[in-house]
Amino acid sequence: MQDNVPASGGGPSRLFILRPVATTLLMIAILLAGIIGYRALPVSALPEVDYPTIQVITLYPGASPDVVTSAITAPLERQFGQMSGLKQMSTQSAGGASVITLQFQLELSLDVAEQDVQAAINAASNLLPNDLPYPPTYSKVNPADPPIMTLAVTSSAMSMTQVQDMVDNRIAQKISQVAGVGLVSLAGGQRPAVRVRLNAPALAAYGLTSETIRTAITAANVNSAKGSLDGPTRSVTLSANDQMKSVDDYRKLIVAWKNGAPVRLQDVATIEQAAENIYLGAWANRQQAIIINVQRQPGANVITTTDSINKMLPALKASLPNSVEVATLTDRTTSIRASVKDVQFELLLAIALVVMVIYLFLRNAVATLIPSIAVPLSLVGTFAAMYFLGFSINNLTLMALTIATGFVVDDAIVVIENIARYIEKGEKPLNAALKGAGEIGFTIISLTFSLIAVLIPLLFMGDIVGRLFREFAVTLAVSILISAVVSLTLTPMMCARMLSHQSLRKQNRFTRASERFFTRLIDTYGTWLRKVLNHPWLTLSVALGTLLLTILLYIWIPKGFFPIQDNGIIQGTVQAPQTVSFSNMADRQQRVASIIMKDPTVESVSSFIGVDGTNAALNSGRLQINLKPLSERSERIPEIISRLQQQTAQIPGIQLYLQPVQDLTIDTQISRTQYQFTLQAMSLDELSVWVPKLMTELKKLPQLEDVSSDWQDGAAVAYVNVDRDSASRLGITMSQVDSALYNAFGQRLVSTIYTQASQYRVVLEHDTTNNTGLDALNDVRLISSDGGTIPLSSIATIEERQGPLAINHIDQFPSTTISFNVASGYALGEAVDAITQAEQQMNLPADITTRFQGSTLAFQSALSSTVWLIVAAIVAMYIVLGVLYESFIHPITILSTLPTAGVGALLALMMAGKDLDVIAIIGIILLIGIVKKNAIMMIDFALAAEREQGMKPYDAIYQACLLRFRPILMTTMAALLSALPLMLSTGVGAELRQPLGVCMVGGLIMSQILTLFTTPVIYLLFDRLATRFRRVPRQEEETE
């Protein structure tokens, strides 16, 4: 065969056609590299695009929100505000806790941010209260990111304090050591402690005060260095019985001497082993439990981290007593694996559909095999590049590969169809391969680089959305590039070796019937094409109409950000009146959980109340609802949420907010709903005036539902108004007053019990069992300058006021966050417009600033760049095509096909009830790259016919349209069917994939119908314009 090789022809494919062994080995190398890369790639729901985020928590039991703000939050804010790379700082100061969330720029390393945070905490430490029981602690975690795993620890025989001790020492620490874990928090924590409840009448009878008791306990229990004795022959370490470690030790403690007799602590107080904080509670399916919430570090892989935890769980469970049970309530990887598995199935289905299309068009098993090999080679080879680029197997990269299935086969189809045409004309396979590949090589290069050019703007998208789609764009671009290489190397080589005139001429009933069908179809197309070419202005009017309709549809269509996914987990917040007590809140929380547990779609419920780093106020309770797998329920999350809210509405005095857990978390604040809008002012007084007014207006908007605010200024405050003159006359200072109140009502941590494994606190408080109202303040007694004790009521009056339940700041200024969901039947864009309009109509003062947060802010950013992104894609493609064709005119002809795809995509979205979200926008951008393929194939052949055969433009474009009709139809069908599984997907995470499929299918159908007619007409129009412009200079020369 080599002896009959033509001296020229084949273009870039010639070397590979003539060297089949080298070509085969090269393809095997690509395949093996891809397989190795696939096995090493991590799996995740989405690309890792988290902002570097650190949460700083400072606990100050008993402190009011005002005290926490001024004494803790403000000093820390000032230091954190000086850090470089800080994007936003949000703080929440509640009774007993300060929570500061620091979000850094995407480019900043989390480890660098951690060092800056530690340095800022050290710098602020001297400004913090001296009696702060715990120093500020930080975690590399986004508090708004739901836990990747939730465990419930229960026991039928042990108390919750004993269970907590085991969880602390045996489970939580081990899980914290797992790579990727950012924070292990214990909800409903019942840390063991010795609680000293003072009996006010007994104290008064002995003439003692709480300060006397606190001083005695502090002095009696110490743990400090004592030194050693170093003698001539030996050394002795000094030790003493300076620690009290048991409840009995504290009961026997002498706190004073009266009339020569000792007064022991048990004489004036009840001492018991109990929980450090009695105002915390957690339940798993209504059974009291310790809830372990595991949150990942920003950027950590969910599946890798969770797998590591699951591997150690059996050993951890084995170390616990038989009466202690550890149950996994939530495992986020379940839905992630199911979602990825569904996309993998859709990828395989797309491959099968594409191969079926190839066979239907080529009607030959051998001819079908050749382009079919291009699909796995291109897709599998892409995994190698993904590995070296640090990507993961996730929903977006698998979606890119699914869409690429239709793309990667296009080039091979074009090549094999052109080679087969020469073989059918009588050429030998080798000559046909060289001629066909050489003739089509430039077209393949044009198709490839113009399609990749469309993806380039995606790489320059800013912020988190750009990071999110970078893996999508690069994965798709790499697969297209590999497919071009395969199509120019392996495909023509296989055609030269496997195709023959006899194999292509094999006939059966199916091939004869399909041949007659395609012949009639081409004849019908040719007839209509003649009519269209003879009435160009009508066709041009249709083309112009599609452009105008595209603009109108873009304006009309509802716009969203990111599809709401059904991952089988619902987060809930139970809101009660601001004056609710702990026991009352616990009862309400349990009633809500009971109703939810009865729902047939619910598998488990975990809930907790109390103020800690996760929950900001006593009147808020948290819920995590785990639904049954999607295969075991017929309803989606929106229907379930609506039903649960209706069922719990019967409980008086509570409001239940529910939202589905999403794979993408952009927010940094724990919110009751999906979207947030913030107001910021110079003072709390201004916010107190305008927040209620704005809330009233927003609740009227039909586009919104579940409107709520974290502004809570109706908490009951017992204001102690001290007569300073009287206090001074009696020798009593304000420091004594504060200390006495703290001793009585602040769960004050007055001492620490040290053991070999951990430390436990001694908690001091008044026993208010028989006196729970404001009258309990009358039991507080103070020591006067003469050594006697006087009641607080003798120097102070008590009045009940209202005050803040929590104080929020954003970037050091007072703020409030309004949360909302988008009402059914509306899109996020409509909700944002409605809020903006309502805000403008209110004429807020100039010193009150507003802005959207989290997902809503990202939506605004993405929406503002959408038009420019599409324009950039078109410009990039024009530049590439202009360079390839060395023409200003032909790229415009090719780009004229784009409005038809836009009309089809937007109409399909509206018919399917989908918003124009970022996933749909990506689909439209891909359509820009796909639909121009039809025009490129037509124009390439028309230009070749004009140049090589001397045809007139009319005849050249007409012949090109007929010759390329079958491959155009074949490639369009392949691309359409590759998107069809995404459009029809129903599994876990289908909401994420459907908009892309709908856009692709709708756009391809519309563009296929119209561009077969509009492209040749526009080609002839621009050819006439170009001819006319060329004549003008000639006429000027003749005139001269």
Swiss-Prot record:
UniProt cross-references to Gene3D superfamilies, sorted A to Z: Multidrug efflux transporter AcrB pore domain, Multidrug efflux transporter AcrB pore domain like, Multidrug efflux transporter AcrB TolC docking domain, DN and DC subdomains, Multidrug efflux transporter AcrB transmembrane domain
Disulfide bridge map: none
Organism lineage string: Bacteria, Pseudomonadati, Pseudomonadota, Gammaproteobacteria, Enterobacterales
Membrane-related topology note: Multi-pass membrane protein
GO cellular-component term (any): plasma membrane
Name this polypeptide is given: Multidrug resistance protein MdtB
Family statement: Belongs to the resistance-nodulation-cell division (RND) (TC 2.A.6) family. MdtB subfamily.
UniProt KW keywords: Cell inner membrane, Cell membrane, Membrane, Transmembrane, Transmembrane helix, Transport
Molecular function via GO: xenobiotic transmembrane transporter activity
Predominant localisation class: membrane
